[in-house]
């Protein structure tokens, strides 16, 4: 097995480890003063039992596309169906694709991936560059993502991160006491056999209401729910016994969330630019976050932990 290329950053009282071999995924973020391990860390950088459940893997195209197909501007886009039980394409493969370093210092790293005619990405018919820029500061980890359309036609995009937090923030943390909060506006009901939107936006039940209020315990049970973000879109985890709090900020371009957890050790709080199956969902496209870039256009996104 090829050795994984890991780069360690230090700054602002934090350390981070970036796995260049697997989508420039930040697989570790630690706070030096408290010993907190903020992100769920893989037991081995190259032996991941589930590549989505460690660090903050990049998803492109994010979430599910039914049949792996959709039509935009008269062109049919076809992605491989890599989730046979749902008949969907799921999350793309950038999370397992090597990225190249373009800039580096002790507390920062920029890495990028470029697809072109000679090196296409899956069957995606566009040349593009996706750049991830990490920086550690006193207020945590900043991630700037830049996506550039290098083709001569409009390019649809669906972007997200499968950011996975450890409920046991420190060795002293009681995972069962940890509280989660997400700023949400509406739940997006899904058919739980295909995990695709049904077209309904139900009122919050007790779990969603507690999550929105910050009184929900992630260790109380497994969860898999899809939402539209609300307010500033903040996501937080709080250890009430130590007073430690993890805050996850994402800019307004990430208008959707997927909240997923095993009810024991971790919680995924996933920022996404669009709804699941955005191009085919039973909503108008302007309601699903479906977006595109014009030729040579660059869109930037910002996140912070």
Where are these regions (language model features)?
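Acidic, contiguous internal or C-terminal segments within carbohydrate-active enzymes
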Residues: 9, 16, 20, 31, ...
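Short, hydrophobic/aromatic-enriched beta-strand segments in well-ordered soluble domains
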Residues: 18, 111-113, 239, 296-305
């Amino acid at each position: 097995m090829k050795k994984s290329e890991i780069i360690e950053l230090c700054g602002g009282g934090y350390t981070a480890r970036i796995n260049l071999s697997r989508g420039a995924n930040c697989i570790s973020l630690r706070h030096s003063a408290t010993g907190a391990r903020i992100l769920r860390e893989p037991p081995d950088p190259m032996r991941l039992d589930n590549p989505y459940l460690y660090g903050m893997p990049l998803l492109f195209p994010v979430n599910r596309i039914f049949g792996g197909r959709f039509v935009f501007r008269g062109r049919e886009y076809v992605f491989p169906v890599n989730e046979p039980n749902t008949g969907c394409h799921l999350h793309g493969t950038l999370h397992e694709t090597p990225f190249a370093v373009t800039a580096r210092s002790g507390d920062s790293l920029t890495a990028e991936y470029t697809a072109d005619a000679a090196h296409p990405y899956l069957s995606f018919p566009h040349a593009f560059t996706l750049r991830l820029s990490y920086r550690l500061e006193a207020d945590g980890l900043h991630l700037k993502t830049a996506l550039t359309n290098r083709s001569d036609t409009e390019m649809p995009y669906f972007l997200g991160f499968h950011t996975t937090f450890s409920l046991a923030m420190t060795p002293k943390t009681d995972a069962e006491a940890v509280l989660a909060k997400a700023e949400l506006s509406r739940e997006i009901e899904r058919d739980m056999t295909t995990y695709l939107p049904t077209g309904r936006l139900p009122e919050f039940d007790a779990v969603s209401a507690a999550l929105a209020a910050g009184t929900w315990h992630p260790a109380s049970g497994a969860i898999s729910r899809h939402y539209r973000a609300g307010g500033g879109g903040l996501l937080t985890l709080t250890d009430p016994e130590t007073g430690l709090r993890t805050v996850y900020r994402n800019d307004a371009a990430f208008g959707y969330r997927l909240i997923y957890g095993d009810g024991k050790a971790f919680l995924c709080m996933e920022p996404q630019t669009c709804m699941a199956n955005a191009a085919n969902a039973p909503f108008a496209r302007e309601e699903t976050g479906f977006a595109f870039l014009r030729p040579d256009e660059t869109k930037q996104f910002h996140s912070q932990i």
